[in-house]
Amino acid sequence: MTASPRPAEFSPADLAPIVGALRAAGCVFAEEEARLLASSARTPADLTALVTRRVAGLPLEQVLGWAEFCGQRIAVDPGVFVPRRRTEYLARVAIMLGWQAARPGEPVVVLDLCCGTAAVGAAVAAALDHAELHAADVDPAAVRCARRNVAAADGQVYEGDLYDPLPGTLRGRVDVLAANVPYIPAGEIALLPPEARLHEPRVALDGGADGLDLLRRVAAAAPQWLAPGGSLLSEVSERQAAAARRAVAASGLGTRVTSSSDMDATVIVGTRYGTLHR
């Protein structure tokens, strides 16, 4: 068996011009980025290619091919939505709900909707003793990436619009439905940093006129898919919280808002009334 090439070793002097180039391109954490890029390069030519892509404006995670999320290394392909650090809070809330739903000898059924890389689903499944993981996204590139990220959990990933591609056997069985829907108002897309605006799919960013179009669609059908006692949870901005809560409540779910000031994250939780029985 042929051993994989080892990363090249670069001295501080080698990295100095790279730090300068990254800083000139507007990278705030240029030193850290230079170290990460160097650790991913097999040869000096590789490093040059990586730096060129980063300086051109590609998100660091797409250049590296991975992002750290909840302590896991999540594969991120070019053109795929990059999991945000604030979304770790959504994953943590989902994990807590998964623990509460756990029953001896039975899996916690987890659905990661609008999954992107499936970072949330992968993190939740990794934290639970026994999870049955499903994920779905409309973007084919995201689906390919997600399948790699959930392989360790034996997760299933489906391609299609929201619930459309899901197997009917999931209806009424989902304990934790994490929907990381796009929630940026359409009129604010142009204000996003170029990294997101130019290199991530608009379908993963654009939430319609007020940013809540997708959440309304997800919430409207959620009761059909949730198990009794199961919960839908979704990330929104703080200023959208009241309207988002009304949208989820309109589907008949009991609602609450939870937030983390440290992570600048707001999550809407909607729970299907009833006792969890299987």
Residue ranges: model-predicted function:
Residues 1-28:
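Non-catalytic nucleic-acid substrate-recognition regions in nucleic-acid-modifying enzymes
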Residues 209-272:
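Conserved Class I SAM-dependent methyltransferase catalytic core
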Residues 37, 57, 87, 120, ...:
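Residue-level signal for inorganic ion chemistry
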Residues 181-214:
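Mobile active-site "lid"/loop adjacent to the S-adenosyl-L-methionine
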Residues 273-278:
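Flexible, glycine-/basic-rich loop-and-beta segments that form/coincide
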Residues 22, 98, 150, 222, ...:
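Conserved hydrophobic residues forming the short capping helix/wall of the S-adenosyl-L-methionine
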Residues 89-191:
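Conserved SAM/SAH cofactor-binding pocket of Class I
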Residues 2, 28-97:
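Conserved AdoMet
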